[in-house]
Amino acid sequence: NAEKTVIRDITIRNSAYWTIHLIGCYDALIDGISLLNNLKIRNGDGIDVDHSKKVRIANCFIESGDDCICLKNRREFEEYGSCEDIVVTNCVMTSRSCAIKIGSENMDKIDNVLFNNCIIKNSNRGIGIQNRDEGTVSNVIFSNILVDCMFYSDVWWGKAEPIYVTSYPRAVGNHKDA
């Protein structure tokens, strides 16, 4: 239930798991940060926006072994409601998984999202929308995005797809992100 949260002008290096995880936040700003994670670490996400509203991420540089920026609604935090009114702008990202991801954990609504003026370089997958659970994804705009993908290895998620979209249901009993 944090309101008016600001994370600005910091550098974080070599996070072993999700670096910044906003849960149930309202009116958050992440601006001018650098996240320099090891590109060989799985699940080393950069920024995860989870059940949060009115979030702006701007002017960031993110290197991550997993998702650089991920919007989601995880089951264990459903009391915080949906993820909506998100703006990501002027960011540069490199990932061995998916630089920009919506899902795959989505038990609620992800709505009114803008990704604008971003560069994705040397990533195994550029943009991914993985709506594998009962939630919905709507009103998402990608504008002025440069995507440069490279295939790295079968051990990483993705095969150098600039854009990947799936609504294939998660396996019964599997509630883990994949």
Which sequence ranges carry the predicted segments?
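Extracellular/periplasmic carbohydrate-active domains that bind, remodel
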Residues: 1-178
